[in-house]
């Protein structure tokens, strides 16, 4: 289930999972329902910091949803992904015959953080 570059098991510092989804407009409510089932499982995982789902403002957007999930470490994310309940939840989303969602997940590390009033060199 893990794609190349999609795992961060060796990373002991905070990571962010960003997953961009293309979902047909008529399937968006069903997609969000499935995603919430998965998010409930992630929320109880050790090392989970938080997540949010963003929806494109424009109906014309190719990437209709963006999920941003923060983890204490890549290792914590990797461990959470091994949970059989989580894997089953993902399979339900992927194998749902009424959903034609395409996901583009990747794990990232912050390299620059900016807050109000910060001056960057």
Residue ranges and their predicted role:
Residues 15-22, 53-83, 121:
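Short, well-ordered beta-strand segments in beta-rich or mixed alpha/beta enzyme
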Residues 6, 25, 29, 80:
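Charge-dense, low-complexity intrinsically disordered segments
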Residues 27-50, 85, 89-93:
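Short amphipathic alpha-helical segments
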Residues 29, 75-77, 113:
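Residue-level signal for secondary-structure boundary sites
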Residues 10-16, 26-32, 66-70, 116:
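A broad, low-specificity signal for short, low-complexity segments enriched in glycine/proline
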Residues 1-15, 52-63, 89-121:
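Glycine-rich beta-strand-turn "strand-cap" elements at beta-sheet edges
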